[in-house]
Regions:
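Alpha-helical transmembrane segments of polytopic integral membrane proteins
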Residues: 69-72, 89, 93, 127, ...
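Active-site His/Glu-centered metal-binding helix of metallohydrolases
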Residues: 66, 92, 96, 100, ...
Length: 291
């Protein structure tokens, strides 16, 4: 075995432009805080988030739950206008609690679970009971078969809402944030609440109206557990440039809703609920024709 020994020059060891004095100053400056600190002292703890800030999102979630409970109580007493208003108020609280948690950096697993349970009451159980209670008093006049149909349709809506929330929680980490998989439960609740509110003030509880009410529950339930993508409002960049068209439509829609809430809310939620399935069918037809 032959071993070759080669003399290495200083230029090969020390890179070009290296200044030992500058490097020593740099290393000393980096080490000075550690050398100057007291080794026995403990690091200062990070100041905790104030309890009031941590509770704020959960207080909003509690407001959502309270509105759902109030909607159920109002429906039992026959006040369907207030029941519908309570469900829409629950939607406002539900839209605020998550945003407040992100703004204050107080998101937690407890908050997410609490929000899901509140959504089940306000957007799952409450709309189903409101729709059933609106028709249960009059539907008995048309025979017991219609009563069973109303009970099954309302229960089907509640079950679909539970499945929708469970699927959302299970796929929250991997889902596309731009879209919802299936109709969101607040939107489904808004459709049912708007229909009952509108029907209680504008329609008589005849057989056609009652059948349509429970049909709305069944359709909303099917759309909740479907895989049809719905646009997520949470991912809209409100700071980006928007067309002048939106500056006209949005204020006009709000003005019409304030002027006459029941029909306008029913129209808005019907458009949102039906637009995604229509677009989904349109894309399927285009693909089949192109193939």
């Amino acid at each position: 075995v032959t071993i070759q020994v080669r003399h290495v020059t200083d230029a090969e060891i020390v890179p070009k432009g290296f200044d030992p004095y500058d490097e020593a100053v740099f290393i000393f400056a980096e080490l000075w805080p550690a050398l100057n600190s007291d080794s026995t002292s403990t690091p200062q703890p990070v100041p905790p988030v104030r309890r009031g800030v941590f509770l704020l999102p959960n207080i909003l979630t509690t407001g959502c739950l309270a509105c759902g409970f109030f909607a159920i109580v109002s429906a039992i007493h026959g006040d369907f206008a207030r029941a519908g208003q309570a469900i829409f108020a629950a939607m406002v609280f539900d839209g605020l609690d998550g945003r407040v948690a992100r703004w204050t950096r107080t998101e937690s697993v407890f908050g997410k679970e609490f929000d899901s349970l509140a959504d089940m009451v306000s957007f799952g159980v409450a709309p189903a009971l409101v729709a059933y209670q609106w028709g249960v008093a009059a539907i008995a006049e048309y025979g017991s078969g219609w009563g069973r149909f109303g009970w099954i349709a309302s229960f089907f809506y509640a079950v679909c809402a539970a499945l929708r929330l469970a699927r959302f929680n299970a796929r929250a980490s991997t889902a596309d944030k731009r879209y919802f998989e299936g109709l969101p439960s607040p939107s489904a609740a808004g459709l049912v609440a708007a229909f009952v509110w509108f029907s209680s003030e504008w329609l008589e509880p005849n057989l056609a109206g009652l059948a349509l009410s429970f049909g709305v529950c069944a359709i909303a339930g099917v759309l909740m557990i479907s895989a049809i993508p719905y646009q997520s409002i949470k991912q809209i960049d409100w700071n980006a440039r928007v067309k002048f068209f939106y500056f006209v439509i949005v204020p006009l829609s709000l003005a019409l809703v304030v002027a006459n809430p029941p029909p306008m809310l029913l129209l808005l939620f019907t458009c949102y609920v039906s637009l995604a399935p229509l677009m989904w069918v349109w894309r399927k037809l285009r693909r089949s024709v192109g193939a």
